[in-house]
Regions:
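Conserved C-terminal alpha-helix-loop-beta "cap" of PLP-dependent enzymes
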Residues: 119-121, 313-388
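Active-site C-terminal subdomain of aminotransferase-like
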Residues: 154, 180, 187-190, 195, ...
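Conserved PLP-anchoring active-site segment centered on the Schiff-base-forming lysine
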Residues: 116-134, 163
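PLP-dependent aminotransferase-class I/II
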Residues: 144-182, 186-191, 196-203
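Short, positively charged and aromatic/hydrophobic N-terminal segments
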Residues: 25, 29-42
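Catalytic PLP-binding core of fold-type I/II PLP enzymes
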Residues: 196-228
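Conserved N-terminal alpha-helix of the aminotransferase class I/II PLP-enzyme fold
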Residues: 58-106, 128-133, 139
Length: 390
């Protein structure tokens, strides 16, 4: 298979074929049975901008996993690959004393970290659009902890909002009848594609330390945040300002995996117990270590992140040039244009994206999401079709 080959899932089988954007029924590497199926069923190969985890993994990761496949290593993250990845992450974060753990997915990681920090009567403060509040099926609440939401500003929380929640609770004479704020959760980049700037993170961190509330940063899309044109933070800044955060792999080139970085030593005791209790202690833990070793070799993590952001910003610029309003000032890989329903219908026979909110009659906010693997040719096609439809 060539470098640009991928797997296309048909309703009946999984076969290696040319990517959808380059599909040709005459291509010699497409089995005739698939060609016949496409012709008889009018199967359309869609270009997917729905999310940033539709593809598998970067070829370097797959190659490294194959090369190490027959190695015999200890389980549960105690192998040499995980240890090497820990050392690499400590170095790039300028956090030599950080405790680093590898988990499989974002919801599992959020649930494990939050449950490790909070007492049974405490909750976690986050904005209304926070992932733990709206897209985790009550995972945090299932542990007995309330998610205390506040209205964010462009998807972001502020020190003032944090202090308001804290004061409202502790100034109440009947405070023991209510859930006590116990920590703060933020995302970088946010769920709406915006980023926290260094002065914002410093102010939030200072407020959290003043109120003795641990600060947890969800980094599922951290690479995309670091690659944003207006970003002025580094991994070292985040490690310095947050009690705990994680570096997302699932959405940025890995098959799966999130690297939790704990900088507050009070969180460390018992954390592996919590990982195990939440089903996150992977027996073949080396699969996680190898992926993060590879992502942080030769700046691959940031190369992949920059590619996704560059493609998203091409789309944003094209939309702005046509006078399309965008719901958020996103500088990352997620863009939220407000489009006429007629345009959405016109595009829907070729493109997949998410509908986020129906606004005024005939107008809908959608999410267009690029990834580390988005083909520039597919962005060209989308821009061309948008130009024709608008």
């Amino acid at each position: 298979m060539g470098r640009d080959s991928s797997f296309w899932l048909s309703p009946v089988f999984l076969l290696p074929v040319t990517p959808p954007g380059n599909f040709s029924s005459k291509d010699s590497n497409i089995p005739q049975i698939l060609t016949n199926f496409a012709e008889t069923s009018n199967l359309a190969f869609m270009i997917n901008f729905e999310c940033d985890y539709t593809e598998g993994a970067h070829a370097s990761i797959l190659q490294r996993l194959a090369e190490t496949n027959m190695e015999q290593t200890p389980g549960y993250g105690k192998d040499r690959h995980c240890e090497n990845a820990r050392q690499i992450i400590r170095r790039v974060c300028n956090a030599p004393d950080a405790d680093v753990h590898f988990l499989v997915g974002g919801t599992q990681t959020n649930k494990t970290v939050i449950a490790s920090i909070l007492r049974p009567y405490q909750g976690v403060i986050c904005v209304e659009t926070g992932h733990i509040a709206v897209h985790e099926t009550g995972a945090i609440e299932s542990t007995g902890h309330k998610v205390i939401t506040v209205p964010g500003i462009n998807g972001k929380i502020t020190p003032q909002l944090i202090e308001q929640v804290y004061r409202r609770h502790f100034d109440d004479k009947g405070l023991e009848h209510c859930v006590q704020p116990g920590m703060v959760y933020i995302s970088q980049s946010t769920e709406v594609g915006t980023v926290y700037h260094l002065n914002e993170l410093e102010a939030i961190s200072a407020m959290c330390r003043k109120l003795e509330l641990p600060l947890f940063l969800d980094g599922a899309r951290l690479g995309y945040g670091l690659a944003a044109s207006d970003n002025d933070t580094s991994l070292a800044d985040i490690a310095r300002l947050c009690d705990v955060f994680y570096i997302g792999g699932t959405k940025i080139g890995a098959l799966f995996g999130e690297a939790v970085v704990i900088n507050n030593p009070s969180i460390t005791p018992g954390f592996r117990y919590m990982i195990k209790q939440n089903g996150g202690l992977l027996a073949k833990g080396r699969l996680l270590g190898i992926q993060f070793e590879t992502l942080f070799e030769n700046d691959l993590y940031m190369q992949l992140s920059r590619h996704a952001v560059e493609q998203a910003m091409r789309i944003r610029c094209a939309l702005e040039a046509k006078g399309v309003a965008l719901a958020y000032a996103s500088t990352t890989n997620q863009q939220f244009p407000i489009l006429p329903d007629s345009v959405i219908e016109h595009l829907s026979d070729r493109y997949i994206f998410s509908t986020t909110e129906h606004l005024t009659p005939g107008m809908t906010e959608v999410r267009i999401c690029t990834s580390w693997a988005t083909l520039s040719e597919n962005v060209d096609r989308l821009i061309d079709d948008l130009d024709k439809a608008l």
